[in-house]
Amino acid sequence: MDHQTLAAHEAVDLHEIVNFKTLCIAKSKLMQGLVFDQELKDLMEKDVQQSIQDLTELQAVYERASFQAPVPQSRPTPIIN
């Protein structure tokens, strides 16, 4: 399939995941400054690198897929006349 389209709920889910991964990267980088155990620092750095790779892949999906949110032609019925 050459042209991929995301439904509205998929676009929202993808946006939430990208935001979450971005916050995880920021938190891991921040916490590395508070950790003294080198083994834990190495593990946290590995987590940051993996999260950056995951985020790059998610951003590629985000850029490649178009978003489709159909707008209904009919107007809602007014509650009050």
From Swiss-Prot:
Entry keyword Nuclease: no
Keywords assigned: Sporulation
GO biological process: sporulation resulting in formation of a cellular spore
Coiled coil: none
Gene that encodes it: yraG
PANTHER family assigned to the protein according to its UniProt record, in alphabetical order: SPORE COAT PROTEIN F-LIKE PROTEIN YHCQ (PTHR39183:SF1)
Stated family: Belongs to the CotF family.
Record's subcellular location: Spore coat
Name of the protein in question: Spore coat protein F-like protein YraG
